[in-house]
Structure formats: structure tokens, C-alpha cells
């Protein structure tokens, strides 16, 4: 993700997707589903690793190849590597596994950062949709739980991403002025992120927020820690 190290599909997005993915996995496990968490979390971590631009993801195969290479180094057999990589390449079509549905939903939840809670369309999510997984099983619809999840996700995004005014155009702002301000904010974000070594980035910037403010994220926290 050299093209976008901190932005829409950079490591901030991936870290939030990991938080959301682990919480969703906890919800599924509470409902009696089995979840291959090893494959799921690594697929989330790699799902945008092959991207060369923002917008529609045209590089899923490259991201999947990076995951296959990583799992090969971990000693995983071919069939397992292919299944894990398939969570990336098939995540937008079918969601035929629990893990695929979780990945797609965890990725999509971060769209709230761009569209806002009220502008987010839940049809982006395979979570709680009537999609068959592992036979005819599907997570029952629970509008109240889904709304609570979205509210907590929105709050978490607000606490772990740049303020909207840093990345959105202001009223009557010229395109040139906006680009200059956006570029300055991006450089500041890179400098901030670079202050923490990569090995502590996730825990320091994201997991610690969830734990320190768990009273604001009861649903996310309870299922993340499950």
C-alpha cells in the first residue's frame, strides 16, 4: 500500500477492519458458528496489500497472492493457502463462508468514515443479510444489534481517524487550497504514524482505544475480547 500508507486503504483502515472483524467473529461464535480466526485475521490484514490506487478494488488477485506467499512461509498447505486467499478474491461475490462474510463486512464498515453513519447503506454488509453460509445457516436478523454495532463503529472511527475537517473540503474553498491543506494533513499523519514502530502500531493506536474506552464500545469490546 505504498500509494496510500495512511489513507483510505492504508494501515489505519486495515487496523480498524481487524478490530471490526474480530468483534464480528465474536458475534458469530456466540451464535454457534465456527470461525477460522487464523485465516480470517490474516486475510483482513492482507486484503488491500496489493492495491495500487483508491476506488474500486482491481487488485484483489495481487493482495491474495501476497497472502498466499505469507502463508507459504508459515508452512500452510496449498489447499489452506488457496482457501484463505479466496476470502479476499471472493469477498465481494457470494460470501459463501462465515469468514468471507466477516471480511467483507469488516472492510465495508470503515466506509462510515467517508459517508457518515446516516449515509451508510447497510446493503454494503453481508453481516446479518440472508446469505447462506455453510449450508443453509445464516445469522438471524437483529436490527437493534445492527444499529448498536453501527453506532459504536462510527464512534470508534471518530476516535481513531483524522477529524473530518482535515480531509474534507470546506465551504467556498478553492480546489487548490483544499489540495494544499489535504497534502499538509497527510504529511502530518505520516509523521504521527511514523513515531510508533510498526510492531506496536495496532496495539498503540487502535486496540488501546477500544480497551481504554470500553464503556463507549460495549458490543465491540465484549465480542472483540471473546
Where on the chain are the PLM-derived regions?
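Short, function-defining helix-loop hinge/capping sites that tune catalysis or transport
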Residues: 55-56, 115
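Short helix-to-loop capping/linker segments positioned immediately adjacent to catalytic or ligand/cofactor-binding
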Residues: 54, 73-76, 93-96
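Inter-helical turn/loop segments and adjacent helix faces that build the functional surface
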Residues: 31-32, 71-78
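Membrane-interface starts of transmembrane alpha-helices
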Residues: 77-85
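Short, conserved micro-motifs enriched in small and acidic residues
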Residues: 11, 57-58
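Divalent metal-dependent phosphate-bond-processing catalytic cores, especially two-metal-ion Mg2+/Mn2+ enzymes
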Residues: 3-33, 46, 93-226
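His-Asp-centered metal-binding catalytic motifs of divalent-metal-dependent phosphohydrolases/nucleases
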Residues: 35-55, 63, 84-93
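An active-site-proximal "capping" alpha-helix that borders the catalytic cofactor pocket
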Residues: 16-24, 58-73
Amino acid at each position: 500500500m505504498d500509494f496510500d500508507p495512511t489513507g483510505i486503504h492504508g494501515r489505519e483502515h486495515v487496523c480498524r477492519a481487524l478490530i471490526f472483524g474480530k468483534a464480528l467473529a465474536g458475534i458469530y461464535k456466540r451464535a454457534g458458528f465456527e470461525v477460522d480466526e487464523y485465516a480470517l485475521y490474516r486475510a483482513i490484514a492482507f486484503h488491500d496489500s496489493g492495491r495500487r490506487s483508491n476506488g474500486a478494488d482491481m487488485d484483489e488477485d495481487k493482495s491474495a497472492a501476497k497472502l498466499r506467499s505469507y502463508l507459504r512461509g508459515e508452512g500452510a498447505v496449498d489447499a489452506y493457502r488457496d482457501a484463505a486467499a479466496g476470502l479476499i478474491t471472493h469477498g465481494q461475490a457470494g460470501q459463501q463462508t462465515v469468514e468471507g462474510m466477516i471480511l467483507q463486512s469488516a472492510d465495508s464498515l470503515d466506509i462510515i468514515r467517508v459517508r457518515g453513519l446516516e449515509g451508510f447503506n447497510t446493503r454494503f454488509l453481508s453481516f446479518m443479510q440472508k446469505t447462506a453460509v455453510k449450508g443453509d445457516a445464516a445469522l438471524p436478523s437483529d436490527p437493534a444489534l445492527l444499529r448498536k454495532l453501527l453506532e459504536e463503529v462510527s464512534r470508534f472511527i471518530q476516535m481513531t481517524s483524522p477529524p473530518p475537517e482535515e480531509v474534507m473540503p470546506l465551504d467556498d474553498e478553492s480546489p487548490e487550497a483544499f489540495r494544499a491543506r489535504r497534502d499538509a494533513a497527510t504529511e502530518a499523519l505520516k509523521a504521527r504514524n511514523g513515531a510508533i514502530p510498526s510492531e506496536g502500531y495496532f496495539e498503540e493506536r487502535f486496540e488501546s482505544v477500544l480497551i481504554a474506552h470500553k464503556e463507549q464500545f460495549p458490543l465491540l469490546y465484549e465480542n472483540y475480547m471473546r
